[in-house]
């Protein structure tokens, strides 16, 4: 089973990745996930996939996220620190990054420096 850390779970790459994981639970597990600011969708995803670590980049919405997942055993880490934690989680086999543009650079670089597999995906050429 491949253990996945997912950066940008609420965008199209993230949503499609979660769809693949959902259809193949014997092959994949989400260990950690992050999102930008869509707290409603992200809370639903956290409730469904039950990661060990969840990160919301928009620190003004952390309280709302914590409230929505208070009954779950999930560590919530805000902001860029959280994205880095998701990208470098030791137990993760693969880091899937759906973060658009330069915002995804730091998590991608730290994931690679940590020796993680980081599949390359391009939405638009």
Regions found by a protein language model. Give the residues of each.
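ADP-ribose/adenylate-binding Rossmann-like module
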Residues: 96-99, 112, 116-125
């Amino acid at each position: 089973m491949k253990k996945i850390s997912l950066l940008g779970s609420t965008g199209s790459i993230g949503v499609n990745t979660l769809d693949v994981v959902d259809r193949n639970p014997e092959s994949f597990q989400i260990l950690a996930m992050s999102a930008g600011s869509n707290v409603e969708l992200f809370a639903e995803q956290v409730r469904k996939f039950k990661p060990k670590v969840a990160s919301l980049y928009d620190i003004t919405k952390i309280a709302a996220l914590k409230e929505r997942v208070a009954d779950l055993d999930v560590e919530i880490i805000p902001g860029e620190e959280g994205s880095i934690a998701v990208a470098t989680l030791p137990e993760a086999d693969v880091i899937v990054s759906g973060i658009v543009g330069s915002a995804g650079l730091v998590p991608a670089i730290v994931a690679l420096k940590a020796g993680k597999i980081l599949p390359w995906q391009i939405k638009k050429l």
